[in-house]
Amino acid sequence: MMSMDEMRGNYDSNSYKSADHDCHKDCGRVIESQTLPLCEGTNITPTAVTTPVVAKIPVVLAEKEVQIDVEARMKLKEKFFEIKRIKKDVFLTQCELLPRAGVIENGVPITGKLFLSGFVRKNIEFATADCVKHDVVSGEIKHTTEKIPFTCVTEVTYITPPILGNRGIQQKTDLFCGRCDCECECEEERLGKLTCEEFLEDSITLVEKPFCELLGARIFEADIQRKPCYEHGEKVFDELLEKMVVHIRVKVLQLQQVAVNDTDAGTGSMCRK
Protein backbone atom coordinates (compact mmCIF):
# COMPACT_ATOMS: atom_id res chain seq x y z
CA MET A 1 0.00 0.00 0.00
CA MET A 2 1.38 3.42 -1.06
CA SER A 3 2.08 6.04 1.54
CA MET A 4 0.62 9.52 1.41
CA ASP A 5 3.94 11.02 0.25
CA GLU A 6 4.23 8.52 -2.63
CA MET A 7 0.67 9.22 -3.75
CA ARG A 8 1.34 12.96 -3.62
CA GLY A 9 4.53 12.49 -5.67
CA ASN A 10 2.72 10.47 -8.35
CA TYR A 11 -0.04 13.07 -8.51
CA ASP A 12 2.47 15.90 -8.94
CA SER A 13 4.33 13.93 -11.65
CA ASN A 14 1.14 13.21 -13.59
CA SER A 15 0.05 16.83 -13.29
CA TYR A 16 3.42 17.96 -14.66
CA LYS A 17 3.19 15.55 -17.62
CA SER A 18 -0.35 16.68 -18.37
CA ALA A 19 0.64 20.33 -18.24
CA ASP A 20 3.69 19.63 -20.41
CA HIS A 21 1.50 17.78 -22.95
CA ASP A 22 -0.97 20.67 -23.10
CA CYS A 23 1.87 23.15 -23.58
CA HIS A 24 3.24 21.21 -26.57
CA LYS A 25 -0.25 20.83 -27.97
CA ASP A 26 -0.90 24.57 -27.86
CA CYS A 27 2.55 25.90 -28.83
CA GLY A 28 3.68 23.25 -31.32
CA ARG A 29 7.01 21.44 -31.43
CA VAL A 30 9.76 20.33 -33.77
CA ILE A 31 8.82 16.89 -35.07
CA GLU A 32 12.09 16.05 -36.82
CA SER A 33 15.26 17.83 -37.90
CA GLN A 34 18.34 16.48 -39.66
CA THR A 35 21.39 17.74 -41.53
CA LEU A 36 21.60 16.44 -45.10
CA PRO A 37 24.98 15.30 -46.46
CA LEU A 38 26.55 16.66 -49.64
CA CYS A 39 26.01 14.45 -52.69
CA GLU A 40 28.89 14.38 -55.14
CA GLY A 41 28.26 14.63 -58.87
CA THR A 42 29.95 15.04 -62.24
CA ASN A 43 29.59 18.11 -64.42
CA ILE A 44 28.58 17.15 -67.96
CA THR A 45 29.19 19.24 -71.05
CA PRO A 46 26.12 18.99 -73.30
CA THR A 47 26.58 17.87 -76.87
CA ALA A 48 25.00 19.77 -79.74
CA VAL A 49 24.40 19.18 -83.41
CA THR A 50 26.83 20.74 -85.84
CA THR A 51 25.82 23.81 -87.79
CA PRO A 52 24.41 24.77 -90.22
CA VAL A 53 21.10 23.36 -89.07
CA VAL A 54 17.41 24.19 -89.41
CA ALA A 55 15.68 24.49 -86.03
CA LYS A 56 12.12 25.16 -84.98
CA ILE A 57 12.35 27.71 -82.18
CA PRO A 58 10.17 30.42 -80.59
CA VAL A 59 10.62 33.69 -82.47
CA VAL A 60 9.68 36.99 -80.82
CA LEU A 61 6.95 38.73 -82.81
CA ALA A 62 6.36 41.68 -80.49
CA GLU A 63 6.90 42.88 -76.95
CA LYS A 64 4.93 45.61 -75.24
CA GLU A 65 4.14 47.14 -71.86
CA VAL A 66 0.42 47.84 -71.57
CA GLN A 67 -1.19 50.24 -69.10
CA ILE A 68 -4.59 49.19 -67.74
CA ASP A 69 -6.62 51.47 -65.46
CA VAL A 70 -8.99 49.68 -63.09
CA GLU A 71 -11.46 50.92 -60.49
CA ALA A 72 -13.20 48.49 -58.16
CA ARG A 73 -15.43 48.77 -55.11
CA MET A 74 -15.66 45.99 -52.57
CA LYS A 75 -17.44 45.34 -49.31
CA LEU A 76 -15.63 43.33 -46.66
CA LYS A 77 -17.34 40.68 -44.60
CA GLU A 78 -17.15 42.79 -41.46
CA LYS A 79 -16.24 46.32 -40.44
CA PHE A 80 -12.52 47.05 -40.28
CA PHE A 81 -10.50 49.50 -38.24
CA GLU A 82 -7.56 49.82 -40.65
CA ILE A 83 -5.86 48.05 -43.55
CA LYS A 84 -2.62 46.39 -42.46
CA ARG A 85 -1.22 44.89 -45.67
CA ILE A 86 -2.23 44.17 -49.27
CA LYS A 87 -0.43 41.56 -51.38
CA LYS A 88 -1.08 41.63 -55.12
CA ASP A 89 -0.43 39.28 -58.05
CA VAL A 90 -1.39 39.56 -61.73
CA PHE A 91 -2.67 36.67 -63.87
CA LEU A 92 -3.63 36.55 -67.56
CA THR A 93 -6.56 34.39 -68.64
CA GLN A 94 -6.52 35.46 -72.30
CA CYS A 95 -3.82 36.72 -74.63
CA GLU A 96 -5.03 36.37 -78.22
CA LEU A 97 -3.39 37.91 -81.26
CA LEU A 98 -5.30 38.84 -84.41
CA PRO A 99 -2.25 38.97 -86.69
CA ARG A 100 -3.82 40.70 -89.72
CA ALA A 101 -6.12 43.13 -87.90
CA GLY A 102 -3.62 46.00 -88.04
CA VAL A 103 -1.54 47.78 -90.67
CA ILE A 104 -0.50 45.78 -93.75
CA GLU A 105 2.07 47.08 -96.24
CA ASN A 106 2.78 45.27 -99.51
CA GLY A 107 1.04 42.20 -98.18
CA VAL A 108 3.25 42.07 -95.06
CA PRO A 109 1.57 42.68 -91.66
CA ILE A 110 3.19 45.52 -89.74
CA THR A 111 0.93 45.63 -86.68
CA GLY A 112 -1.70 43.41 -85.07
CA LYS A 113 -4.37 43.54 -82.37
CA LEU A 114 -3.71 41.85 -79.04
CA PHE A 115 -6.67 41.00 -76.80
CA LEU A 116 -5.83 40.76 -73.10
CA SER A 117 -7.93 39.55 -70.17
CA GLY A 118 -6.98 38.66 -66.64
CA PHE A 119 -7.32 39.63 -63.02
CA VAL A 120 -5.43 41.10 -60.10
CA ARG A 121 -5.57 38.81 -57.09
CA LYS A 122 -5.41 40.78 -53.86
CA ASN A 123 -5.01 39.42 -50.36
CA ILE A 124 -6.08 42.10 -47.88
CA GLU A 125 -5.15 41.91 -44.21
CA PHE A 126 -7.19 44.19 -41.97
CA ALA A 127 -7.65 44.85 -38.27
CA THR A 128 -11.01 44.83 -36.53
CA ALA A 129 -12.09 46.90 -33.53
CA ASP A 130 -13.68 44.32 -31.26
CA CYS A 131 -12.87 45.98 -27.95
CA VAL A 132 -12.69 49.74 -27.47
CA LYS A 133 -11.92 51.19 -24.04
CA HIS A 134 -10.77 54.74 -23.49
CA ASP A 135 -7.45 55.01 -25.38
CA VAL A 136 -7.09 51.32 -26.28
CA VAL A 137 -8.47 49.57 -29.37
CA SER A 138 -8.12 45.79 -29.54
CA GLY A 139 -9.19 43.39 -32.26
CA GLU A 140 -8.13 40.60 -34.58
CA ILE A 141 -6.09 40.50 -37.77
CA LYS A 142 -8.18 38.95 -40.53
CA HIS A 143 -7.84 38.64 -44.27
CA THR A 144 -9.86 38.33 -47.44
CA THR A 145 -8.86 37.49 -51.03
CA GLU A 146 -10.51 38.99 -54.09
CA LYS A 147 -10.01 38.82 -57.86
CA ILE A 148 -10.38 42.10 -59.73
CA PRO A 149 -10.89 41.39 -63.47
CA PHE A 150 -9.67 43.52 -66.35
CA THR A 151 -9.81 43.34 -70.13
CA CYS A 152 -8.40 45.50 -72.93
CA VAL A 153 -7.21 45.54 -76.54
CA THR A 154 -3.88 46.96 -77.65
CA GLU A 155 -2.01 47.27 -80.94
CA VAL A 156 1.44 45.70 -81.20
CA THR A 157 4.14 46.46 -83.77
CA TYR A 158 5.89 43.39 -85.11
CA ILE A 159 9.61 42.96 -84.60
CA THR A 160 9.37 39.90 -86.81
CA PRO A 161 6.18 39.42 -88.86
CA PRO A 162 4.23 36.24 -88.11
CA ILE A 163 4.09 33.39 -90.58
CA LEU A 164 0.52 33.11 -91.83
CA GLY A 165 -1.18 30.64 -94.10
CA ASN A 166 -4.38 31.26 -96.00
CA ARG A 167 -6.73 28.65 -97.36
CA GLY A 168 -6.33 28.46 -101.11
CA ILE A 169 -9.13 28.85 -103.62
CA GLN A 170 -10.83 25.56 -104.32
CA GLN A 171 -9.94 24.15 -107.71
CA LYS A 172 -12.66 22.32 -109.59
CA THR A 173 -12.21 20.08 -112.61
CA ASP A 174 -15.20 19.31 -114.79
CA LEU A 175 -15.31 16.09 -116.73
CA PHE A 176 -16.58 15.73 -120.28
CA CYS A 177 -18.88 13.05 -121.54
CA GLY A 178 -18.45 12.77 -125.30
CA ARG A 179 -20.62 9.78 -126.01
CA CYS A 180 -24.31 9.30 -125.78
CA ASP A 181 -23.74 5.93 -124.22
CA CYS A 182 -21.38 7.33 -121.56
CA GLU A 183 -21.39 4.95 -118.66
CA CYS A 184 -21.90 7.54 -115.95
CA GLU A 185 -25.14 6.17 -114.62
CA CYS A 186 -26.84 9.55 -114.92
CA GLU A 187 -30.52 9.93 -115.37
CA GLU A 188 -30.10 11.27 -118.89
CA GLU A 189 -27.64 10.51 -121.66
CA ARG A 190 -26.30 13.63 -123.35
CA LEU A 191 -23.10 15.18 -124.75
CA GLY A 192 -21.28 17.80 -122.67
CA LYS A 193 -20.36 18.16 -119.03
CA LEU A 194 -20.43 15.05 -116.91
CA THR A 195 -22.97 16.07 -114.30
CA CYS A 196 -22.66 13.15 -111.95
CA GLU A 197 -18.91 13.38 -111.27
CA GLU A 198 -16.30 16.10 -110.74
CA PHE A 199 -12.79 16.54 -109.32
CA LEU A 200 -12.12 18.99 -106.45
CA GLU A 201 -8.82 20.24 -105.04
CA ASP A 202 -8.42 22.16 -101.74
CA SER A 203 -5.17 23.70 -100.47
CA ILE A 204 -4.95 24.08 -96.67
CA THR A 205 -1.88 25.49 -94.90
CA LEU A 206 -1.51 25.05 -91.14
CA VAL A 207 0.80 27.32 -89.14
CA GLU A 208 1.80 27.58 -85.51
CA LYS A 209 -0.50 29.68 -83.36
CA PRO A 210 1.17 32.72 -81.73
CA PHE A 211 1.33 32.58 -77.94
CA CYS A 212 2.16 34.97 -75.12
CA GLU A 213 4.41 35.20 -72.09
CA LEU A 214 3.76 37.44 -69.10
CA LEU A 215 7.13 39.00 -68.29
CA GLY A 216 6.18 41.19 -65.35
CA ALA A 217 3.78 43.70 -63.88
CA ARG A 218 3.77 46.95 -61.91
CA ILE A 219 0.78 48.10 -59.90
CA PHE A 220 0.10 51.60 -58.58
CA GLU A 221 -2.84 51.68 -56.22
CA ALA A 222 -4.93 53.98 -54.05
CA ASP A 223 -7.28 52.44 -51.47
CA ILE A 224 -10.01 54.77 -50.29
CA GLN A 225 -11.92 53.70 -47.20
CA ARG A 226 -15.58 54.63 -47.54
CA LYS A 227 -18.81 54.60 -45.55
CA PRO A 228 -17.33 55.19 -42.10
CA CYS A 229 -19.34 54.61 -38.97
CA TYR A 230 -18.56 54.94 -35.28
CA GLU A 231 -18.55 52.11 -32.79
CA HIS A 232 -17.77 52.98 -29.18
CA GLY A 233 -16.32 56.29 -30.32
CA GLU A 234 -13.91 54.81 -32.90
CA LYS A 235 -14.26 55.15 -36.66
CA VAL A 236 -14.56 51.88 -38.58
CA PHE A 237 -15.22 51.29 -42.26
CA ASP A 238 -17.50 49.05 -44.26
CA GLU A 239 -16.46 49.61 -47.89
CA LEU A 240 -13.23 49.94 -49.85
CA LEU A 241 -12.78 51.82 -53.14
CA GLU A 242 -9.71 50.76 -55.11
CA LYS A 243 -8.12 52.67 -57.97
CA MET A 244 -5.30 50.85 -59.75
CA VAL A 245 -2.95 51.54 -62.64
CA VAL A 246 -1.63 48.18 -63.82
CA HIS A 247 1.36 47.96 -66.16
CA ILE A 248 1.83 44.49 -67.64
CA ARG A 249 4.66 43.50 -69.95
CA VAL A 250 3.86 40.76 -72.46
CA LYS A 251 5.86 39.05 -75.16
CA VAL A 252 4.22 37.52 -78.25
CA LEU A 253 6.00 34.56 -79.84
CA GLN A 254 5.51 32.01 -82.61
CA LEU A 255 7.30 28.77 -83.36
CA GLN A 256 9.12 29.23 -86.68
CA GLN A 257 11.74 27.33 -88.65
CA VAL A 258 15.07 29.15 -88.48
CA ALA A 259 18.34 28.33 -90.26
CA VAL A 260 21.26 28.55 -87.82
CA ASN A 261 24.72 29.09 -89.35
CA ASP A 262 28.19 29.63 -87.88
CA THR A 263 29.73 33.07 -88.27
CA ASP A 264 33.27 33.51 -89.53
CA ALA A 265 34.10 35.85 -86.64
CA GLY A 266 33.27 33.19 -84.10
CA THR A 267 31.18 35.56 -81.97
CA GLY A 268 28.10 33.39 -81.97
CA SER A 269 25.56 31.99 -84.35
CA MET A 270 23.63 33.68 -87.11
CA CYS A 271 19.97 32.86 -87.65
CA ARG A 272 18.30 33.08 -91.02
CA LYS A 273 14.64 32.29 -91.58
Curated annotation (Swiss-Prot):
One GO CC term, this protein: exosporium
Subcellular location: Spore wall
Stored InterPro entries: CsxC, DUF7852, Exosporium_prot_C
Superkingdom of this protein's organism: Bacteria
PANTHER family the record matches: DUF3794 DOMAIN-CONTAINING PROTEIN, EXPORTED PROTEIN-RELATED
Protein name: Exosporium protein C
Organism: Clostridium sporogenes (strain ATCC 15579)
Lineage of the species this protein comes from: Bacteria, Bacillati, Bacillota, Clostridia, Eubacteriales
